Amino acid sequence: MPRTDNDSWDLATSVGATATMVAAARAIATNADNPLIADRFAEPLVRAVGVDFFTRWVTGDLVVADVDDTESGWQLAQMPDAMAVRARFFDAFFQDATRAGVRQAVILASGLDARAYRLDWPAGMTVFEIDQPEVIAFKTTTLAGLGAVPRADLRTVAVDLRQDWPKALTEAGFDAGRPTAWIAEGLFGYLPPEAQDRLLDNITALSATGSRLACEAIPNRPQQDAEKARELMRKATARWREHGFELEFGDLGYEGDRADVELYLQNLGWQSVGTQMSQLLADNGAAPIPHNNDSVTMADTIYYSSVLTA
């Protein structure tokens, strides 16, 4: 079902289900023979959500070779390594920020992110998680049931990012006078282009000099390439739906030309370094994801680490 301005979701539907899919990929990566990450909360969270397709994927009952369309450029088989190196990128970002003295972090659209529970945070660290109320409530309750305890001062902020989240964040104790480490992981594609700009504007307005931001973006492509990408994605998910997958990824994102993230941030006073997914995979010894001259694939995603210097 296409997105609407005021749509909402839980972790089994719409945009929320993509967070569960990513957590499933992290769970598989964690259980690999030579794991690139260790996210012990990923599998129990996926099981608790209860989407059969993702549960079978995590347990190995889903045979990926039977599900994937190898010509589409979007394959389940690629996701565990891709999401593992993505997680490592954002983990390292937080570790670098805390080593630099940052003691305040904000995880935007936190989904099933368990970093507040699994990373080694320094004393005095405050972590804010922002997401839809149903998502926040489910994860908090489930992790408490598992006996998990946050390793930092965790403040959950149950608000839609399309609402006045800066106000809600401030009311939760956020201090705009202190440097902050922000992450927007797997978020921009689910925002309209103008909302992406507004989010970056709001982050900047709330950030003291020395704040840091990590995010990801898919490069703009000509309209015909975007249409080709949607066609290939629908081809991939059509195969998945034969095995119980119920999402149509092509309906979850927003179309339209987006600002170049690095240039947009530069104009706001941020200095950025971008690393392509293909490079992250190579740096971590993971199998490459082929580029597709006719379309965008996961290999084209760029991961930015930025510092506010103005």
UniProtKB/Swiss-Prot annotation:
Enzyme class per UniProt: transferase
Residue positions binding S-adenosyl-L-methionine: 131, 160-161
Protein family according to the UniProt entry: Belongs to the UPF0677 family.
Keyword annotations from UniProtKB, A to Z: Methyltransferase, S-adenosyl-L-methionine, Transferase
Protein name per the record: Putative S-adenosyl-L-methionine-dependent methyltransferase MUL_2766
Signal peptide: none
One GO molecular-function entry: methyltransferase activity
Taxonomic superkingdom: Bacteria
Protein purpose: Exhibits S-adenosyl-L-methionine-dependent methyltransferase activity.
One GO BP annotation of this record: methylation
SUPFAM superfamilies named in the record: S-adenosyl-L-methionine-dependent methyltransferases
Pfam families in UniProt: LCM
Oxidoreductase found in the keyword field: no
EC number: 2.1.1.-
